[in-house]
C-alpha cells in the first residue's frame, strides 16, 4: 500500500525541499519505489534534482492537474522524470501559480490532486509532496490526498505561534475533506547542537509543540 506524505510549512526556507529529496532518496536506497511531487511553483525540488530549467518543461504537475480538470485521458507515467538515485519526479514550475488561480472556479477544487494520486499510487510505496510555502489551494490539495504531513521547522526562530495556523488548517482539512489525515511529525532542521542557543530553541520548540494538537 502506498503511503502519501506532504512536506509542508507556510514559512519558506525551513528545509522542505531538502527534506523531501533526502527522504525520498533514502527510501529508494532501502528498496522502496518513490515518487516525489514538486507542488511548488518555484520548482525548487525539480531544480535541485538536476532538472535546472523547470519552466521549460512541457509536462509537469500543472499540466497533469489540468488534464484531470478537463477530463482528458492520461497515462500513469505522464510527465514523470527518472532520476539516477532511483526516484521518480513529477516536476513543478511557474505554471502552478496560474493553476492555483483557476482552481477557484473548478468543481471539487480541493480534490484535483487526489484524482492524480489515484492514477499513479499503485506504482509506488511512497509518494512525497513538496508543498508551496503557503496555505493556498495547491497545498490544500496536497493535504486532501495525503495520509500524513511532515512539518520541517527551522530551529533558529520560535515558530510555535506561526505553526498554529498550519495546524488549524490541517485540522480543518481533516474534519471536512480527509478524515485519515495525521501529522507525521515535526522535523527540526538546521540545528547546531554545539551552541547553547540552538539547544535552548530546540527544547523550547518541543515544549511549545507538545501543547499543539490536531483537532478531530
Where are these regions (language model features)?
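P-loop NTP-binding core
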Residues: 1-216
Amino acid at each position: 500500500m502506498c503511503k502519501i506524505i506532504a512536506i509542508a510549512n507556510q514559512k519558506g526556507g525551513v528545509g522542505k525541499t531538502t527534506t523531501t529529496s533526502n527522504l525520498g532518496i533514502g527510501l529508494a536506497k532501502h528498496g522502496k519505489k518513490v515518487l516525489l511531487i514538486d507542488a511548488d511553483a518555484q520548482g525548487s525540488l525539480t531544480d535541485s534534482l538536476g532538472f535546472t530549467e523547470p519552466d521549460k518543461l512541457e509536462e509537469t504537475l500543472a499540466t497533469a492537474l489540468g488534464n484531470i480538470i478537463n477530463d482528458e485521458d492520461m497515462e500513469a507515467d505522464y510527465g514523470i522524470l527518472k532520476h539516477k538515485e532511483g526516484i521518480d519526479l513529477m516536476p513543478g514550475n511557474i505554471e502552478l501559480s496560474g493553476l492555483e488561480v483557476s482552481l477557484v472556479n473548478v468543481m471539487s477544487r480541493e480534490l484535483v490532486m487526489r484524482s492524480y494520486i489515484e492514477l499513479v499510487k499503485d506504482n509506488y510505496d511512497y509518494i512525497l509532496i513538496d508543498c508551496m510555502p503557503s496555505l493556498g489551494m495547491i497545498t490544500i490539495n496536497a493535504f486532501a490526498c495525503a495520509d500524513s504531513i511532515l512539518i520541517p521547522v527551522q530551529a533558529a526562530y520560535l515558530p510555535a505561534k506561526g505553526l498554529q495556523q498550519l495546524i488549524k488548517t490541517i485540522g480543518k482539512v481533516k474534519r471536512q475533506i480527509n478524515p485519515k489525515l495525521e501529522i507525521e511529525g515535526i522535523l527540526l532542521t538546521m540545528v547546531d547542537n554545539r551552541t547553547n542557543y540552538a539547544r535552548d530553541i530546540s527544547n523550547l520548540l518541543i515544549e511549545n509543540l507538545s501543547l499543539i494538537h490536531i483537532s478531530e
